[in-house]
């Protein structure tokens, strides 16, 4: 019979222990008096907790692996508060259990010691024995292996077959700055209990961070750590204002590394080049770019009102669609032209450098008059993408009474994909109401809302998709603000469905 206990002596991590009594008769209903007395003594001892009964004698590690790992494999405590990176201050020596084996059997043995071997990125699990060149030392997990009794039966069997002594030795392993992960370094440096930043957006060789106020005193150190710990990153920048100017770019500060903001990125098998300091680019929208691209079929037409450097326009053009792409920012316009040539779609994309409203009321109006006037057999599907979440809904007013003449069939009316931010408790309904208010109609039953991403706590980015009603698009049409004659684009998403999707996406972020 075996008693399992949790032993947590003062000042040490807890460990599970199994204690066996060879003289006890097994019984499902009766525990001998002597064993009962021992149990009571153990329960009264400081730091000991009764867990259950088993049938072997061994020492077991506690289960909170992550917490224990941070205790041993964390930087020295005296780096706390460091604002200028000193890599030499991260040296630390830890005591690691090792198993001495002949070098010719290492490979064969390691396959059987996966559980027991040390699993730590950046640390070699097998090293040369400094006292015997014909032998090797296998690093073992210090939270699983304490003595030879810590090995499992199968592991001991393999050791016996290979004539390896299970005797455990100790090895002083020196940890340096190179051995620690970026999150471990920042957690050790920043004030205790404060959030650390281990994530960033990668734009080619640039790491783009959004630091919080409490992290700013450590900003240069954080930038250098990001460069050190992420191969290929040679510059770290921090956004120092919101995207609130007319060109959608933001001011940034180079925290560490080179000043060069000219970069090249690959997204969905397409290449884009640009000056990141002068244009807008968000790598977190890659999935959204693909989603919209999949909605169009060869021969369709896309009007991209706020095209940036081309993440919507170029993939759509590659599908043999006709694309009209516009951006007010001269730098975006320049790189949009460049990237169209780079991706060999310059013959399929017409590029403009206009204000969004002027683009809609000029080139878009002219093209729509021609497209919607074609015979039914030749009419393509028309899509309008408006990716300017802070203001795009305001530009919907440009569609009001945009066209003259007799309305086309409702099935050929343009489909709008308009992006917006929302901090509302019901963001989908909020976006519907605001977009409908600008158009002067209700979009309640004729639109779908897609949650693009969670931007910040209580701030969502969404895309509302709908067909522009003929009563809005054409002059001299009777309008009913509560409803209109055009069929819904698709079944309306319920608030519950949107809430479920939001919860799922936030949990994956």
Curated annotation (Swiss-Prot):
Family designation: Belongs to the class I-like SAM-binding methyltransferase superfamily. TRM5/TYW2 family.
Gene3D superfamilies tied to this protein: Met-10+ protein-like domains, Vaccinia Virus protein VP39
Sequence intervals crossing the membrane: none
Name the record gives this protein: tRNA (guanine(37)-N(1))-methyltransferase
Chief place of localization: mitochondrion
InterPro entries, per database record: MeTrfase_TRM5/TYW2, SAM-dependent_MTases_sf, TRM5-TYW2-like_MTfase, TRM5/TYW2-like_N, tRNA_Gua_MeTrfase_euk
Organism: Homo sapiens (Human)
Function recorded in the entry: Involved in mitochondrial tRNA methylation. Specifically methylates the N1 position of guanosine-37 in various tRNAs. Methylation is not dependent on the nature of the nucleoside 5' of the target nucleoside. This is the first step in the biosynthesis of wybutosine (yW), a modified base adjacent to the anticodon of tRNAs and required for accurate decoding.
Molecular function terms from GO: tRNA (guanine(37)-N1)-methyltransferase activity; tRNA methyltransferase activity
EC number(s) recorded for this UniProt protein: 2.1.1.228
Domain of life of the source: Eukaryota
Disease: Peripheral neuropathy with variable spasticity, exercise intolerance, and developmental delay: An autosomal recessive mitochondrial disorder with multisystemic and highly variable manifestations. Affected individuals suffer from a peripheral neuropathy, with distal muscle weakness and atrophy, and distal sensory impairment. Additional variable features include early-onset hypotonia and global developmental delay, poor or absent motor skills, exercise intolerance, poor growth, cerebellar signs, spasticity, and seizures.
Keywords: Cytoplasm, Disease variant, Methyltransferase, Mitochondrion, Nucleus, Primary mitochondrial disease, S-adenosyl-L-methionine, Transferase, tRNA processing
């Amino acid at each position: 019979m075996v008693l399992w206990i949790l032993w947590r002596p003062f000042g040490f991590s807890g460990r599970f222990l199994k204690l066996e009594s060879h003289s006890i008769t097994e019984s499902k209903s009766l525990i001998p008096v002597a064993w009962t007395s021992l149990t009571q003594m153990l329960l009264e001892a400081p730091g000991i907790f009764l867990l259950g009964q088993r049938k072997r004698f061994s020492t077991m590690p506690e289960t909170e692996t992550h917490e224990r790992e941070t205790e041993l494999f964390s930087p020295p405590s005296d780096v706390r508060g460091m604002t200028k990176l000193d890599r030499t201050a991260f040296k630390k020596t830890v005591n690691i259990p090792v198993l001495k084996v002949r070098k010719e059997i290492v490979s064969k043995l390691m396959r059987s010691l996966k559980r027991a071997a040390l699993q730590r990125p950046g640390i070699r699990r097998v090293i040369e024995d400094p006292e015997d060149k014909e032998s090797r030392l296998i690093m073992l997990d210090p939270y699983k292996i304490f003595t030879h009794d810590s090995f499992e039966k199968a592991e001991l069997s393999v050791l016996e077959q290979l004539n390896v002594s299970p005797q455990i030795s100790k090895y002083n392993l020196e940890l340096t700055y190179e051995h620690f992960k970026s999150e471990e370094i920042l957690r050790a440096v920043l004030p205790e209990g404060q959030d650390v930043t281990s994530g960033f957006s990668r734009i080619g060789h640039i790491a783009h961070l959004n630091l919080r106020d409490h992290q700013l005193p450590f900003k240069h150190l954080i930038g250098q750590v990001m460069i050190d710990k992420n191969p290929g990153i040679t510059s770290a920048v921090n956004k120092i204002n919101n995207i609130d100017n007319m060109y959608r770019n933001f001011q940034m500060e180079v925290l560490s590394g080179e000043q060069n903001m000219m970069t090249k990125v690959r997204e969905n098998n397409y290449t884009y080049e640009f000056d990141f300091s002068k244009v807008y680019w968000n790598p977190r929208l890659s999935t959204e770019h693909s989603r919209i691209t999949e909605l169009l079929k060869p021969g369709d037409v896309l009007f991209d009102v706020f095209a940036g450097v081309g993440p919507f326009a170029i993939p759509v053009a590659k599908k043999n669609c006709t694309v009209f792409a516009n951006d007010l920012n001269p730098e975006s316009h320049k790189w949009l032209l460049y990237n169209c040539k780079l991706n060999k779609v310059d013959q399929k994309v017409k590029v403009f450098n206009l204000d969004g409203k002027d683009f809609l009321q000029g080139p878009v109006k002219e093209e729509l008059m021609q497209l919607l006037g074609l015979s039914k057999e030749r009419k393509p599907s028309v899509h309008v993408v408006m990716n300017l979440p802070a203001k795009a809904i305001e530009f919907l007013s440009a569609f009001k009474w945009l066209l003259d003449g007799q309305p086309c069939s409702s099935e050929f009316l343009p489909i709008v994909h308009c992006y917006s931010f929302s901090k509302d408790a019901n963001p989908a309904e909020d976006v519907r109401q605001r977009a409908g208010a600008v158009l002067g109609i209700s979009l309640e039953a004729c639109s779908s809302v897609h949650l693009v991403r969670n931007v910040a706590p209580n701030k969502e980015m969404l895309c509302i998709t709908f067909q522009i009603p003929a009563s809005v698009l054409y002059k001299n049409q009777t309008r009913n603000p509560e409803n209109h004659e055009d069929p819904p684009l698709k079944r309306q998403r319920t608030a519950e469905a949107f809430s479920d999707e939001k919860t799922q996406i936030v949990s994956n972020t």
